[in-house]
């Protein structure tokens, strides 16, 4: 299950990435490249990581009119990334357009990237969602609604918190992909995320993938931290 552990490369530039990856010589990781790193380094960072043998979740959370998202996804698919995402709030037409773009842009002989949708960010509390975003549903209801819409639009799954996974399994079935950020070791600070869980708890709740950032990237020994997270995620007793 180690390939379903995604390491968030939340760094400002390639130099920091190179320094971090020195801890992982010989390891083939599944890494997340977000806005900060991609906007700084561009497609070259994807090429660099692919040459190192890593799988890539390109986390740009696209949210625009359908035609723009379709064109953008066509370009992203040509980079040979393994996973991409959109905001479910963009609606069904936009999500369907995203899939069309990925199919058109995928490299010959390869499957299109996994495409998932963001339901609600893990920094969003129910109070914030109601007072600031203007959604009157409960957080669980809003996430379930977006997940159902995502599945109906032909996407593979959603980004959600671990707490929402059991409900989404009921609504969308066991094959629906759930990618869960907000993963922390029990000894770590929560920082700016509200809905968090440990790797062990994520496994128990049924997450398909977990995304782990600071617990690994800010650790004194990143490789040892990675192994600890991996063991908890895979249910290994040491």
Swiss-Prot record:
<protein>
    <recommendedName>
        <fullName>Orotidine 5'-phosphate decarboxylase</fullName>
        <ecNumber>4.1.1.23</ecNumber>
    </recommendedName>
</protein>
<feature type="binding site">
    <location>
        <position position="213"/>
    </location>
    <ligand>
        <name>substrate</name>
    </ligand>
</feature>
<feature type="binding site">
    <location>
        <position position="32"/>
    </location>
    <ligand>
        <name>substrate</name>
    </ligand>
</feature>
<dbReference type="GO" id="GO:0005829">
    <property type="term" value="C:cytosol"/>
</dbReference>
<feature type="binding site">
    <location>
        <position position="193"/>
    </location>
    <ligand>
        <name>substrate</name>
    </ligand>
</feature>
<dbReference type="InterPro" id="IPR001754">
    <property type="entry name" value="OMPdeCOase_dom"/>
</dbReference>
<feature type="binding site">
    <location>
        <position position="122"/>
    </location>
    <ligand>
        <name>substrate</name>
    </ligand>
</feature>
<feature type="binding site">
    <location>
        <position position="10"/>
    </location>
    <ligand>
        <name>substrate</name>
    </ligand>
</feature>
<keyword id="KW-0665">Pyrimidine biosynthesis</keyword>
<dbReference type="GO" id="GO:0004590">
    <property type="term" value="F:orotidine-5'-phosphate decarboxylase activity"/>
</dbReference>
<dbReference type="InterPro" id="IPR014732">
    <property type="entry name" value="OMPdecase"/>
</dbReference>
<dbReference type="GO" id="GO:0044205">
    <property type="term" value="P:'de novo' UMP biosynthetic process"/>
</dbReference>
<dbReference type="InterPro" id="IPR047596">
    <property type="entry name" value="OMPdecase_bac"/>
</dbReference>
<feature type="active site" description="Proton donor">
    <location>
        <position position="61"/>
    </location>
</feature>
<dbReference type="InterPro" id="IPR013785">
    <property type="entry name" value="Aldolase_TIM"/>
</dbReference>
<comment type="subunit">
    <text>Homodimer.</text>
</comment>
<dbReference type="InterPro" id="IPR011060">
    <property type="entry name" value="RibuloseP-bd_barrel"/>
</dbReference>
<feature type="binding site">
    <location>
        <begin position="59"/>
        <end position="68"/>
    </location>
    <ligand>
        <name>substrate</name>
    </ligand>
</feature>
<feature type="binding site">
    <location>
        <position position="184"/>
    </location>
    <ligand>
        <name>substrate</name>
    </ligand>
</feature>
<feature type="binding site">
    <location>
        <position position="214"/>
    </location>
    <ligand>
        <name>substrate</name>
    </ligand>
</feature>
<keyword id="KW-0456">Lyase</keyword>
<keyword id="KW-0210">Decarboxylase</keyword>
<dbReference type="InterPro" id="IPR018089">
    <property type="entry name" value="OMPdecase_AS"/>
</dbReference>
<dbReference type="GO" id="GO:0006207">
    <property type="term" value="P:'de novo' pyrimidine nucleobase biosynthetic process"/>
</dbReference>
<comment type="similarity">
    <text>Belongs to the OMP decarboxylase family. Type 1 subfamily.</text>
</comment>
<dbReference type="Pfam" id="PF00215">
    <property type="entry name" value="OMPdecase"/>
</dbReference>
<comment type="pathway">
    <text>Pyrimidine metabolism; UMP biosynthesis via de novo pathway; UMP from orotate: step 2/2.</text>
</comment>
<comment type="function">
    <text>Catalyzes the decarboxylation of orotidine 5'-monophosphate (OMP) to uridine 5'-monophosphate (UMP).</text>
</comment>
């Amino acid at each position: 299950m180690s390939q379903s552990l995604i390491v968030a490369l939340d760094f400002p530039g390639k130099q920091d990435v190179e320094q971090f990856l020195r801890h992982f010589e010989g390891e083939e990781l599944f890494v997340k490249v977000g806005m900060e790193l991609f906007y700084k380094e561009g497609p070259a960072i994807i090429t660099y990581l692919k040459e190192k043998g890593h799988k890539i979740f390109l986390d740009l959370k696209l949210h625009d009119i359908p035609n723009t998202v379709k064109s953008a996804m066509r370009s992203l698919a040509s980079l040979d990334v393994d996973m991409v995402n959109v905001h479910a709030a963009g609606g069904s037409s936009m999500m369907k357009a995203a899939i069309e773009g990925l199919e058109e842009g995928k490299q010959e002989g390869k499957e299109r990237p996994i495409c998932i949708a963001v339901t609600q960010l893990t920094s969003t509390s129910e109070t914030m969602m109601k007072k600031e975003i203007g959604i009157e549903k409960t957080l669980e209801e809003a996430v379930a609604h977006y997940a159902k819409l995502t599945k109906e639009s032909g996407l593979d799954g959603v980004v959600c918190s671990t707490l929402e996974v059991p409900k989404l399994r009921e609504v969308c079935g066991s094959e629906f992909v759930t990618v869960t950020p907000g993963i922390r070791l029990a000894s770590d600070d929560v920082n700016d995320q509200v809905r968090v869980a440990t790797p062990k708890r994520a496994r128990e709740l049924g997450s398909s993938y977990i995304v782990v950032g600071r617990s690994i990237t800010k650790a004194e020994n990143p490789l040892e931290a990675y192994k600890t997270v991996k063991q908890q995620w895979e249910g290994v007793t040491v």
